[in-house]
A protein has these predicted regions:
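Cofactor-binding loop segments of dinucleotide-utilizing enzymes, especially the Rossmann-like FAD-
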Residues: 2, 26, 89
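NAD(P)-binding Rossmann-fold cofactor-contacting core
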Residues: 16-38
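Adenosine-phosphate binding glycine-rich loop
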Residues: 83, 87-144
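Short, hinge-like loop/turn segments at secondary-structure boundaries
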Residues: 38-42, 125-128
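Conserved S-adenosyl-L-methionine
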Residues: 12-20, 102-106
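Rossmann-like adenosine-cofactor binding region
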Residues: 40-107
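Glycine-rich adenosine-cofactor-binding loop
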Residues: 1-14
Length: 144
């Protein structure tokens, strides 16, 4: 993807000194521009499974309601990965994450990212420490 989450992820990966970062997205121009801006490798969307990498971070809406039966890559491609992260928080377990779990590949859904974003915003707006446990209970209770 090429939205704000993608940009944050790219900055984080760069800060952590990750090498060989690839980006792919359905919008050729936006993705190519993002790759140039952050000095990462660009892969055309229809070539994404012809590349060799270990970690997949899905920052597209593919898998989010109402596209819950879709994945950004095939099950066969997921088998080659060491780790899968999906930024989507709803549904809590996307098809991508469920597939990675079934294949015994390390994985993390966007649920915790959403919770941590909410906690940071709470502190930013209230100048108080967020009630993380209560926030998580509420999120679990209301998550579909």
């Amino acid at each position: 993807g090429t939205g704000g989450v993608s940009k944050s992820i790219l900055l984080g990966l760069k800060k952590l000194k990750f090498k060989n970062i690839f980006i792919s997205g359905r919008n050729f121009r936006n993705t190519k521009n993002l790759a140039l801006k952050y000095n990462v490798k660009f892969i055309e969307w229809d070539q994404r499974e012809n590349s060799n990498f270990n970690i997949l971070i899905n920052a597209t809406p593919i898998g989010m309601k109402p596209l819950t039966t879709s994945m950004p890559v095939s099950k066969n491609f997921i088998k080659s990965l060491q780790c899968v992260f999906d930024v989507i928080a709803n549904p809590k377990e996307t098809k991508l994450i469920k597939t990675a779990k079934d294949l015994k590949i390390k994985n993390q859904g966007g649920y915790l990212m959403a919770l941590n974003q909410a906690a940071i915003q709470f502190k930013l707006y209230t100048c108080k420490n967020p009630p993380i446990k209560e926030m998580e209970k509420s999120l679990r209770r209301n998550m579909i």
